[in-house]
Each structure stands twice: as C-alpha cells, then as structure tokens.
Amino acid sequence: MTQLPPPEQTVLKPAPPELASAPLFDHLEELRRRLILSVVFLAVGMVIAFTYRVQLIELVKVPLTYSELYTTGKVQLVTTKLASQLLLSFNLAFWAGLTLALPFIVWQIWAFIAPGLYPQERRWGLPFILGAGFAFAAGVVFGYKLVLPTMVPFLIEFLAGTVTQMQDLQEYIGTVVTFLVAFGVAFELPILAVILTRLGIVNHTMLRQGWRFALIGIMILAAVITPTPDPANMALVAVPLYALYELGVVLSRVFRVIAPEEQERPAPMS
C-alpha cells in the first residue's frame, strides 16, 4: 500500500518575549492608560484651539479673500441659528485640537503596539508613522495653499449675476475642513501602497500595469475637485496625485515581500 506523505505542519513564529511574558490584565491596564493619556492630549489641544477660535475662523476664511465678490461685500458669511457660533467654535476646536494632539496620540498607539512587534517590524514602524504624518500635513498644506484659493472663488462667482449670495458660515467651514482632510488622506497613497504590498494584497507589478486606470481615476477626481474650465488648475491637482501614485509603485517594489526561493537564490558569480 502506498503511504501518503505526512501533512504539512504550519510553524508559527514565537511571540516576542515582551508580549509573551505580560499577562492579559497588564495589557488591558496599559491600554487604559494609553487611552486616558490620548484623551488628555486631545482635551489640551481643544482648549488651546478654542482659545484661538477667532484666529482659526479667520484662517479658514482666507480662501474667500481671493474672490472679488467677497472683498467688495457682495457675498457675506452669515449664521442662521442662535447657537451656530458656539457649535461652530466647538467643532473647529475639536478638529484643530485633534491636529495638535495627533502626534502625541499616535505616539501612544505606537508605544502600546511596539512591544508586540518583532525587531524588524519595530525598525520600520516609526519611520512609517512619521512618514504618514508628514504626508497628511503636506496634503493639507497643498490643498489650502494651492487648490482652495482657486476652487472657492470659482464656486462663489459661478452664476454670481443671477443670485444673491449669503453663505452659511458653518457650512462653509465644514466644507473647507472636509476638503482639507480629504487631501491629507489622498497624500497617504504611497503609504497605503506599501501597506497593501506588505499584506500581499497588491504588488508593484499590478500597480505598474494599472497606471492607465489610475490616471483616468485621478483625472476624474481632479475635474471634480477643481470645477474650473481651466486645464492648468486641473493639472495642478492631477500631476501631484499621479506623482504620488508613481511614488507608491516605487515604494511597493522597495518594500515588496521577497519569496523564500528568491531569498535562497545564490548570488551570481563575478
């Protein structure tokens, strides 16, 4: 009788010593402590932001100053509810406070998960966190400095001669904040490409072959974000986004998961 080969056994990597030696209660207590510190940092950031709420509102209103209708008083920002100013101040303080506290909150998250990682994972973890933070900040600055000054005046001046405009302050600021957050997330594209590559979901070959679809999607997104008919403004958004896609392809190749047979392949003789 032919004997069947023994079934393959999955060899699990042992847990890091720091993680294996700590009981569950200690992990929960550590999580509780990190959450409390994160909430404290957020509260401090909100208090600081609320103190400068007037300056923050003026900062968000800067893109309006590029519109002649606003500077000449033909378009005004108004509030339509009694508590709108108070609610708006708290809402703006939350987002600004979260922005101020985010580095400290991310550090608390990293300090909690780092003991459960292997040394090679810890080596790349902190640079990725810093890179993600820098990319998000770059996206926010890019949207605020280059895109909003074009988009906001165009939307305000569209059909300006046929309607009388009184823009709701809360809706305007909500739109600006949402737009800036979206641009910050869009600039995380290279980081996302690396994460998906390390998880084995995509690889650099797939990303390279899909560049046409990515370009079409980016052009459509740029047309939506910048509704002006000027191709230069559309290119202002599309070119950086596609450059980020190409950067993601390069990083996907650099941080690709190397197959075992490729690791064991001997180097060619010189």
Swiss-Prot record:
GO term, biological process aspect, one: protein transport by the Tat complex
A GO term from the CC aspect: TAT protein transport complex
Subcellular location(s) per record: Cell membrane
Source organism superkingdom: Bacteria
Keywords per UniProt: Cell membrane, Membrane, Protein transport, Translocation, Transmembrane, Transmembrane helix, Transport
Xref: PANTHER family: SEC-INDEPENDENT PROTEIN TRANSLOCASE PROTEIN TATC (PTHR30371), SEC-INDEPENDENT PROTEIN TRANSLOCASE PROTEIN TATC, CHLOROPLASTIC-RELATED (PTHR30371:SF0)
Function statement: Part of the twin-arginine translocation (Tat) system that transports large folded proteins containing a characteristic twin-arginine motif in their signal peptide across membranes.
NCBIfam families assigned: tatC
Subunit record text: Forms a complex with TatA.
This protein's name: Sec-independent protein translocase protein TatC
